[in-house]
From Swiss-Prot:
Protein name: Autophagy-related protein 11
Topology with respect to the bilayer: Peripheral membrane protein
Biased composition range(s): Polar residues: 1190-1201, 1240-1250
Primary site of residence: membrane
Length: 1264
């Protein structure tokens, strides 16, 4: 997390100064996990201060004492400095632990705040929903009863829920109850009550959980860890005492040797003993106590922080659960939909009635309009056919053309849906009146009444056609005349016409009153002269003279017969004056009529302009209101989306953390499974070895069994042989007894015979003694042989250690084995001799010698010993055979060891070559990394034993910095290439030294520092790239926006290709030149084209397609031509001057010729229908067609008669075209085309291009 309690993001990781990392194992594990606490510091026992003085009167003894105390003080300061450093480190760690817990708490507070806001919104929504549910549950039975009393005569099969019974659908009349399933509503009412209670309990549970989370969070805030305490600065005081002792020692060193010096030194030493040394001991004890306190505080902080983190983790788990409950907070049953359908059924039924009428009328209108259109097209087709026949008849002598069929139109109506029930407007009105009669359904009746009124409301297209203005501009009336005079439009036009007639009647009555008042006022103040005022009333004047004048003329004519000639002359004069008076009256009446007509026209124009202005202002105000509402809506949406974005980011962080935790668990599980798999592999191998051993044991056992079986067979065979031998011996003994005692009776049993023979064999005792001695020697030799076999076994075990010893021992064993075989052969030969002697003795006994029983017993014992010796001999032979087998096995092992040695030598050589290649690759990689850093603009140096990566500009910034680097031990980190041959050393020690040097050279290049530098560089580049990309995107959007805005705006400050310009005629009537309306950018003239039809226009709105820059140069025609082109006699000179200066500009003036295409071809020459969208431009004035000198004529003459050289050399003539300058181009796109106001300052050139009001209005008065 960051220090602000936010989760760290990869995008902003490079901009964070510090981050806090937490170990999930200690946070999410149960409480029995033990923390790695800091051990208590070792007991501190300072040495006793030196106080031994050999001689009080010897200065050197005092110096030695001072030096010892100085050394003691410095050593104590060093030890206390280490403890003080440990105290500061422990305090820093403790402070970090406190801050980490505080950061986690801040993060939790943010989550809890978001949870409270979300819960408040959810609770508001839930409370409103519960109110609606309670209201629905309280009155659904009454509403269901009410449906029974509301008639519903029309049958709509599609109305109602799918479960609604259909048995009453065929009835011609019924109620709204027929469209509702009463049983389903009853069940839904009971289910809705239970669901509402469950939903309320769910809201209460969520509220209780939120309150619990808030209370636990507040408890954590109240129990927040305190800040770490600063350790007392006793080390500085101890250093001060040590410096005092050192300075005293230096002072003592410089003192002379006399009694006064000794006295001063003694007093100073006493001060040390009483003040300084005890104070240093006390301070050291305080520092050690502070160290113990820091360790204890650190361990306590770890435990408390761990408890807080576990509490925070538990709260966050609960918080995630509550958030999921809030998200999933909803009614899980459709019962309320069924209940609400009871309330909505009256409105739904009424809406269906209105919709039925609307669809029926639309279908009828479509049919009628299609018939009308078909008839009209048929009339057009018949007229066209008659015209073609008439034309062919008149042209029949000149052309030969077959009569073709005139194309016609066939109209078909498609997409008609199935017929709805017939519903009239009276049905709707009666249904609404029935609803109005019920007080509880007044609001439903009002809604249906509004829907019923909307049947007669014009559509959006009809409203647009009813109004002549669309957002401040005249609506396009160039649509087809077909299908536009529908009944709705005619009805709307009649309404508009009636409204306008009423307004016109009121206006006419008001105008009559005003004219009458004006006429009365003018009669009172009419002048005598013939200069009548133009503001006479418009009341109709009688063409006949008034009664007084008529009576006077009649009387004068009557008296004329009785008058004299003078009287007749006077009478004629009176008649003439009366005729003139009548003519003058007629003139006055005509002028009054013209003034009245003009006043009416001006009044209409003013009213039209004011109505246009009001429409424009209303449109602007409506759009402004729409914009304000949209802005407020968008601001609310933006705030909502920001909150949602933060919530999603937090959710994403939690999901990422959970995924990381799951990934960590999966990794641990994978590692555990891999370990178990390895253990299983090892166990499998052991089992395989064990199985192989068992197989070998089984094979050995089988072999042993076979040998035992063979041995049993041999023993059985021997037993049978022994039996046969016994039988033979019995027979032999009987024969011997018979030979020894021919007359005696032969005993039946062998022992009796043997005893008898022993008695007879006493004479052979001497020979038996000799045989015993030889047997004893054979037994001794057998024992020696057994000992030798044991020795051979030990020697075989020793042979495992060395191959050479095995060979020698093997040879020795072979020799000894041969000797033993020879000895065995000798023993066998001796046994054979003994047996032969025994047989000889037996034969001698058989010949007649007598023996005793003792001799017989000796013979039996000898035979027994002989059997034992034979058995031992067999065992020795078996052991000899086993020894031969072991010798063969050792030979095979020796051979395998030799092959292994050869393979190991080959593998070591291969590994040496690979190690060399690997070392070379590592060396090249280090060089590539250094080269990469150099390419990125870094310099890699080693300063004071640490690698430093700096910018090359910083390293080479100044010579002073370079000198300081050189003094601080800056060296290159590039490894030495000679270290690559470390594996080619002659001795093992040398190879080890070279290899360690090679590793040391590689360790000098710190990959972490390299990675940090490269990552920081890449992140800086990415940050800069994102910044530039964002700016480029903003500039591109701004450019597109300005370009789109400029495309539809009139440019008047500067011009470039593609700009929209307003062209007006200039005052030059002779050549009828047209120039662009401008402010500060004169001399942009239009190239006239036939498509422009400028003779019938007062203005032209066109888009510039091409701009040609030209400069007037009259020097070409100054040598032989008059400046005035009207005085030139030749046509060629006139033509050249027209090409160079077609608009009669002064010499050296820069001007531009524009090619432009009309923006809307086919537009009327003047604003449509004799009207204008801006203020009226008609001015009541009379002027002469001749050109007049204005007051500014002198200035114009001065400007046009400047020096040719000065005008050619002026900066205005040397300027480039304005369309080549981006700034003017931007101004042309940014400025709006507004009518020039009276107070807008114009440049002198613009004043030259401007015309007098009379001359400008003269052209405008020629319009319609």
């Amino acid at each position: 997390m960051t220090a602000r309690g936010k989760n760290v993001r990869i995008q902003s990781l490079a901009t964070e100064d510090e981050i806090f990392v937490y170990d999930r194992r200690f946070v999410s594990e149960p409480e029995n996990v033990e923390l790695p606490e800091l051990p208590s510091p070792e007991p501190f026992t300072p040495d006793t201060p030196p106080d031994t003085l050999t001689n009080q009167n010897d200065l050197q003894a005092w110096r030695n004492l001072y030096m010892a105390r100085r050394s003691w003080a410095l050593g104590l300061v060093e030890r206390c400095g280490a403890m003080d450093k440990s105290i500061h480190e422990h305090n820093e760690r403790t402070d970090i632990i406190h801050r980490a817990a505080g950061v986690a708490l801040e993060n939790l507070k943010t989550h809890v705040g978001n949870l409270e806001n979300r819960f408040q919104e959810a609770q508001t929504w839930a409370n409103d929903l519960l109110k609606e549910q309670r209201a629905a549950l309280d009155g659904w039975q009454r509403a269901l009863t009410t449906l029974e009393s509301i008639p519903a005569p029309k049958v709509f099969p599609f109305l109602g829920r799918p479960s609604t019974p259909k048995e009453h659908r065929d009835r011609p009349t019924g109620t709204l109850r027929d469209f509702v399933d009463a049983n389903e509503v009853q069940k839904a009412g009971a289910e809705a009550a239970a669901e509402s209670s469950r939903f309320a309990r769910q809201i209460d549970d969520v509220a209780e959980a939120v309150r619990g989370i808030t209370a636990d969070t507040q408890r954590l805030i109240d129990d927040q860890l305190p800040s770490g305490a600063d350790a007392a600065d006793g080390l500085q005081e101890m250093i001060t005492f040590a410096k005092k002792i050192s300075s005293d020692y230096e002072h003592v060193i410089a003192l002379p040797n006399n009694q006064k010096t000794l006295a001063n030194i003694s007093r100073l030493a006493l001060t040390h003993t009483q003040d300084l040394l005890p104070s240093m001991l006390d301070i050291s004890a305080e520092i050690h106590a502070g160290l113990e306190e820091a360790v204890r505080r650190h361990n306590t902080a770890m435990k408390v922080a761990l408890d807080h983190m576990r509490t925070i983790s538990a709260i966050e788990l609960r918080l995630a659960d509550v958030q999921s409950q809030i998200i999933n907070l909803n009614v899980q049953s459709d019962a309320f939909d069924v209940v609400f359908s009871v309330y909505h059924m009256p409105m739904v039924y009424g809406s269906i009635l209105v919709e039925s009428v609307r669809r029926r009328e639309f279908n009828e209108k479509m049919k009628a309009d299609s018939l009308t259109l078909a008839e009209e097209m048929a009339v057009f087709r018949d007229e066209e056919q008659r015209r073609r026949k008439k034309w062919l008849k008149s042209m029949g002598d000149f052309i030969s053309l077959t009569e073709t069929t005139t194309p016609g139109v066939e109209i078909n109506l498609q997409g008609l849906d199935y017929e709805w029930p017939e519903v009239s407007r009276n049905d709707i009105e009666s249904y609404i009146e029935h609803l109005k009669s019920r007080p509880a359904m007044a609001s439903l009746a009002d809604g249906l009444t509004q829907q019923y009124k909307d049947l007669d409301a014009p559509t959006r297209h009809q409203r647009r056609r009813a109004k002549a203005f669309k957002q401040g501009s005249i609506f396009d009336l160039s649509r087809s005349s077909l299908l536009l005079r529908s009944d709705d439009m005619l009805r709307s036009l009649r309404e508009e016409k009636s409204k306008l007639e009423e307004k016109l009647k009121g206006s006419e009555s008001r105008i009559r009153k005003l004219e009458d008042l004006l006429h009365r006022q003018s009669q009172l103040s009419r002048p005598v002269s013939g200069n009548f005022n133009l503001e006479f009333p418009s009341s109709p004047a009688s063409p006949y003279p008034d009664e007084l004048s008529r009576r006077s003329s009649v009387s004068s004519r009557r008296m004329s017969a009785n008058q004299s000639s003078e009287d007749k002359t006077l009478a004629q004069r009176i008649v003439t004056l009366e005729a003139e008076l009548n003519a003058e009256r007629e003139t006055v009446q005509r002028l009054q009529k013209e003034a009245h007509a003009e006043r009416l026209s001006n009044t209409d124009k003013i009213q039209e302009a004011q109505s246009t202005k009001r429409d424009l202002i209303d449109n602007l105000e409506a759009r402004q209101r729409e914009f304000d509402e949209e802005r407020r809506y968008l601001e609310g949406e933006l705030k909502k989306y920001r909150l949602r974005t933060e919530e999603l980011e937090e959710e994403l962080d939690r999901i990422t953390d959970s995924r990381d935790h799951a990934k960590q668990d999966a990794d641990e599980r994978i590692n555990q499974l891999e370990t178990e798999l390895q253990n299983l592999h090892i166990h499998t191998e052991e089992e395989l070895h064990r199985a192989n051993d068992l197989l070998e044991q089984m094979q050995a056992q089988k072999m042993t069994e076979e040998s035992l079986q063979q041995r049993i067979n041999e023993l059985e065979k021997q037993q049978s042989e022994i039996k046969a031998t016994e039988q033979e011996n019995l027979q032999t003994l009987q024969a011997a007894f018979m030979n020894l005692s021919p007359g005696g009776a032969v005993p039946a049993e062998i022992p009796s015979i043997i005893k008898a023979i022993e008695v007879l064999s006493e004479g052979l005792s001497i020979h038996v003694k000799n045989a015993e001695e030889k047997m004893a020697e054979a037994v001794a030799e057998n024992k020696a042989l057994e000992e030798r076999m044991n020795q051979l076994e030990t020697e075989v075990q020793d042979a495992k250690q060395s191959a050479e010893q095995r060979e020698s021992e093997l040879a020795q064993v072979r020799g000894e084995l041969a000797q033993e075989k020879e000895k065995l052969a000798a023993v066998q030969s001796e046994l054979h001799d003994e047996r032969s002697k025994l047989n000889a003795l037996q034969s001698q006994h058989a010949d007649g010698d007598t023996g005793t029983d003792a001799l017989r017993q000796r013979v039996v014992e000898d035979e027994r010993k002989l059997g034992i010796l034979s058995q031992r001999l067999a065992e020795v032979e078996a052991q000899a055979r086993e020894s031969e087998k072991e010798v063969c096995a050792w030979k095979n092992k020796l051979k395998a060891i030799s092959e292994s040695e050869r393979e190991a030598t080959t593998r070591i050589e291969i590994r040496g070559s690979r190690a060399k290649e690997l070392s070379q690759q590592l060396f090249e990689q280090v060089e590539k990394m250094e080269h990469m850093l150099e390419q990125l603009g870094f310099t890699v140096i080693r300063q004071d034993g640490e690698i430093v990566v700096q910018r090359a500009s910083k390293v080479n910034a100044s010579s002073g910095i370079g000198d300081s680097l050189a003094q601080s031990g800056v060296v290159s980190v590039k490894p030495d290439p000679s270290l690559l041959d470390w594996m080619q050393a002659e001795t093992a020690q040398e190879e080890t030294d070279r290899y360690m040097a090679f590793l040391e050279s590689l360790y000098q290049f710190d990959v972490d520092v390299f990675g940090d530098a490269v990552v920081k560089r890449v992140k800086d580049i990415e940050l800069l790239a994102r910044k530039w990309q964002k700016e480029a995107r903003g500039y591109r959007d701004k450019y597109h926006r300005m370009q789109s805005e400029a495309h539809d705006k009139i440019a008047y400050r500067s011009f470039k290709e593609g700009d929209l310009a307003l062209f007006l005629p200039t005052r030059n009537q002779a050549i009828r030149s047209w120039a662009a309306f401008n402010v500060g950018a004169p001399h942009y003239f239009l190239r006239e084209q036939d498509a422009h039809k400028l003779q019938t226009r007062d203005w032209l709105l066109a888009r510039i397609t091409k701009i040609e820059e030209r400069v007037v140069d009259l020097s070409k025609s100054m040598n032989g031509a008059h400046p005035d082109r009207r005085s030139i006699g030749g046509t060629s000179d006139a033509a050249s001057i027209d090409d160079e200066n077609p608009f009669e500009l002064s010499d050296g003036l820069r001007w531009y010729l524009l090619d432009a295409n009309e923006e809307k071809p086919g537009a009327p020459a003047t604003p449509g229908l004799g009207k204008s969208t801006v203020a009226p431009a008609h001015v009541d004035a009379r002027g002469s067609i001749r050109l007049k000198r204005t007051s500014n004529g002198g200035n114009v003459a001065k400007t046009l008669t400047k020096s040719l050289d000065s005008r050619r050399n002026s900066s205005s003539s040397k300027k480039g075209p304005p369309f080549a300058i981006s700034q003017r181009a931007n101004e042309s796109t940014a400025e709006l085309a507004r009518p020039a106001e009276a107070n807008t300052p114009l440049s002198p050139s613009a004043q030259e291009a401007a015309s007098t009001p009379e001359e400008v209005r003269r052209d405008q008065l020629q319009g319609p």
